[in-house]
Amino acid sequence: RRLNHRGLVHTVFLNMGSHFGTRGEEFYIAPYEHRPCSVFPNVFHPDFEAFCRYRARQACRPHRSDPWMLGYFIDNELAWWGRGPGDTGLADAVMKMDATHTAKLALRDFLADRAGKSIERFNALWGTKLKGFDELLALSALPSANDAQREAKREFLRLAAERYFTATSRAIRREDPNHMVLGARFAGTGGAHPVVWEVAGQHCEIVTFNCYPFADLDEGRVYTSPG
């Protein structure tokens, strides 16, 4: 084990969010489906920060003095879009959760705050007829029919990103202040909305993307997508 990566610059994968999200329904917003780009952790779960600290103690502390280690990838290709569009899909996934799910409770509180705690203002924005914000928990969907609705869902995505990158980067640096945080390897440039990139850039030394181009040797071209 002492010879592992000795003399070679290397990185360490932590899989903080993906490991947390595979622990059961209360721990994910989008479930793991035994394929890439499927899971997204419930960053609003009260145990998420503690799990990140546990994972950092386990995986980062042993590397804090390694001169050959470049840094840590937090995760790989999380489903920042839930199962829908990049800006609204995560909020839509939360709306499908059970009324007691902590992410749905967080979304209720977030939307109530945006409406200034006014259910009348909320109903006017969303075209609903709720008598109180707790009734939101019984709904399984909210529309994305206009800019204001999409903006609200996009800002909830920003909140989720802030909770994710704050908890993970803080846990990593607590155990290893000597190496870089290399982002969460978004699935291509479309694998997360730019608001997520912005938040990642505030917490990571490097924001990383996985891109899968292919080369046509006959044409002498490299394509970034099949189209």
List where the protein language model places each region:
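Aromatic-lined substrate-binding rim segments of carbohydrate-active enzymes
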Residues: 1-64, 164-175, 195-197, 201-202, ...
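Conserved, mostly hydrophobic/aromatic
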Residues: 59, 72, 118, 172, ...
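Long hydrophobic alpha-helices with heptad-repeat/coiled-coil character
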Residues: 60, 72-88, 210-227
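Aromatic- and acidic-residue-enriched segments that line the glycan-binding/catalytic groove
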Residues: 5-9, 15-37, 64-142
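A cross-domain feature marking catalytic cores of carbohydrate-active enzymes
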Residues: 12-14, 74-76, 183-186, 211
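Glycoside hydrolase catalytic-domain groove-lining segments
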Residues: 151, 155-227
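The substrate-binding groove and active-site-proximal loops of carbohydrate-active enzymes
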Residues: 1, 31-54, 96, 111, ...
